[in-house]
């Protein structure tokens, strides 16, 4: 099975996350997208101290009507920070026969050099880099850390990097929806509508459980 993997804090999950997942699934012909809420993100603070259980439940609500999407609590089942390389190693144990496609944004691609054990990522998975329309990456090899550049060759016709392991890095321009979790949290705190920014099931969960209401208004 070709399995797409999309991680994040999902605080909360919204329509931009879902649209990226759907476009990658379709264009890469994936069988399923697995959403992985981060338990303890290594590079950012978790705004609002929203428990993992709530963020996991919101993802479940968001994807409930899509049989091609699934969510896992994998990162909450282990101790320590939610490093992607460790998550992928655990997923490899759970799905030994599947072909992985790890979905990240262009900003994350540019900062791979600060990720824990980043060279190991390319041994574990293919990468799909989602970029905004009109912002193609002309020289994606040069954006990688110098220490691993020689492990890749650039296929200009396919617009992808090929790693010595056989895995690839695919670059896709995706529909850009200017929606952020931060803005949604601010709207809730200000008592304003968040309708149509996220699935109705997530909206109802937020209001039913009183999430984000105590955050600083801005």
Swiss-Prot record:
Reactions the enzyme catalyzes: nicotinate beta-D-ribonucleotide + ATP + H(+) = deamido-NAD(+) + diphosphate
GO molecular function: ATP binding; nicotinate-nucleotide adenylyltransferase activity
Pathway per the UniProt entry: Cofactor biosynthesis; NAD(+) biosynthesis; deamido-NAD(+) from nicotinate D-ribonucleotide: step 1/1
Pfam family, one: CTP_transf_like
Record field: transmembrane: none
GO BP: any one term: NAD biosynthetic process
Catalytic class of the enzyme: transferase
CDD domains: NMNAT
SUPFAM superfamilies linked: Nucleotidylyl transferase
Keyword Zinc-finger belongs to the record: no
InterPro entries named among the record's database cross-references: Cyt_trans-like (IPR004821), NadD/NMNAT (IPR005248), Rossmann-like_a/b/a_fold (IPR014729)
The keyword Transferase is annotated on this UniProt entry: yes
The EC number(s) this enzyme carries: 2.7.7.18
Keyword line: ATP-binding, NAD, Nucleotide-binding, Nucleotidyltransferase, Pyridine nucleotide biosynthesis, Transferase
Family, similarity comment: Belongs to the NadD family.
Function text: Catalyzes the reversible adenylation of nicotinate mononucleotide (NaMN) to nicotinic acid adenine dinucleotide (NaAD).
Protein known as: Probable nicotinate-nucleotide adenylyltransferase
